[in-house]
A protein has these predicted regions:
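Active-site-flanking structural segment that lines cofactor/substrate pockets
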Residues: 1-17
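Conserved PLP-enzyme active-site core in the AAT-like
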Residues: 2, 15, 23-196, 200-201
Length: 201
């Protein structure tokens, strides 16, 4: 509880879940997604393709237990050739089913630029202007502590990451975190049974 209070205070969020049982960033993202999406909901990525490791979680590549298998649909809007957001396409792809928007801060294995906190804030403001109740989640892996503010300071409802990377200083062998609104980090997210189930992904 003390460590989670420190994370919530550090990232200026209402709540935090920080556990060694969350084995890595992909596991933390899977836990956050599966705890906040239900059959009939839609997941939108407005910054292009996510990490390869998330493709089976989402169901872009067929996988047992994926979001797609449970009736969650997925839409993706690629960045424009100059790396800017395709606001017109994003607007077109937000609909009554859009429940969660995932924003990957790092460029990962893509050639696009890594997103600054300022740009993430602008994107979230645009999305919330269209659908205020949508959950905006930021994959914060590799982005922690490289700026004076975090995505949680500019409107992100959840930020998710790995303890193996920046927060662990290269020393932590395992662990992950989810920081954000209490409504996004509910009892289901904290369920040890649910966490164990996701360790197989």
């Amino acid at each position: 509880d003390t460590l989670e209070a420190v994370y919530a205070a550090t990232f200026h969020t209402e709540d935090a879940l920080v556990r060694p049982q969350i084995t890595c960033g992909t596991h933390a993202l899977a836990l956050a997604l599966m705890s906040n999406l239900r059959p009939g909901d839609e997941l939108l990525s407005p910054v292009g393709k996510p990490y390869d490791t998330l493709e089976e979680v989402i169901g872009i590549r067929p996988s047992k237990g994926s979001l797609a298998e449970y009736g969650v649909t997925y839409r993706q809007v690629d960045l424009l050739p100059d790396g800017s957001f395709d606001y017109d396409k994003i607007r077109e792809n937000i609909n009554e089913k859009t429940h969660l928007v995932t924003i990957q801060r790092s460029k990962g294995y893509q050639t696009r630029p890594t997103l600054s906190v300022q740009r993430i804030g602008e994107l979230i403001a645009f999305i919330k202007g269209i659908k205020p109740d949508v959950i905006c989640m930021v994959d914060n892996c590799y982005g922690e502590f490289v700026d004076v503010i975090e995505p949680s300071n500019v409107g992100a409802d959840m930020i998710v990451g790995s303890l193996i990377k920046n927060p662990g200083g290269g020393l932590a062998p395992i662990g992950g975190y989810i920081c954000g609104k209490q409504s996004c980090i509910d009892r289901r997210t904290r369920s040890e049974e649910h966490t164990s189930e996701l360790q197989s992904l």
